Amino acid sequence: NTAEELLFDPDIIYSKLNKKALDVLVRSGALDGLIDSRFSGMKHFWSAVVVDRPKKEKRLNENIELYRPEGDFTVEERIANKANLTGVFPMDLVLNKNVKDKLEEYLVPPIAEFDSDLQVVWFVPREIIKRRTKSGKEYWIVNVIDSTSNQTTIRCWGVRERDTIHINRPYMCKIDYDEQWGFSSRSIRHNWRLLG
């Protein structure tokens, strides 16, 4: 199968396979099998076939040359595309086998399987929301996900200016749990560890 067969087949009803449908199929990875040696990567294919959708084969060839520098989607873009379009977080793109083996070796559970005696878990931050307390101190609400696909919130207290949390990267953390407030953590610098 080729891009030409998909785009210019007389048997396909193109009002059904419109630009939006093609966009979702390409960015979710469903059409990876159509990317051949003419394309420098998935982003190049997406730009040439979807963004500037050709009506004729000649225009497709022009697009292939025009968008050649696009290359491939970054890892961050691929994670965002798969998570947003399929609703499933691509843990395989974030957590490599070495890190996964180490977590299992040290018996560190995902946050959904929190153990109050151990108080150490791993997760992947998806979003950081910055807030202020009544007294004006900054704290963060971090939305996280783990291998069980459970999304959870962690409140980070005592945030300092130099503290950083990378989105879509695995972390191990010492956290507390309260029935009323849920998960919380103090001192990102001391209690959070970036894995891999």
PLM features per residue range, with description:
Residues 116-134:
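Structural detector for short beta-strands of small beta-barrel domains
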Residues 131-135, 146, 178:
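Acidic surface patches and DE-rich sequence motifs
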Residues 1-116, 155, 181-196:
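Sliding clamp-binding short linear motifs
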Residues 139-143, 147-166:
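Beta-strand/loop nucleic-acid-binding surfaces
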Residues 123, 166-190:
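Flexible glycine-rich surface loops and low-complexity tracts that mediate binding to linear polymers
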Residues 87, 121, 143:
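Conserved, well-structured core segments
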Residues 119-121, 140, 171:
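Hydrophobic core residues within well-ordered beta-strands of beta-rich domains
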Residues 136-138, 182:
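Short acidic/glycine-enriched loop/turn segments that link adjacent beta-strands
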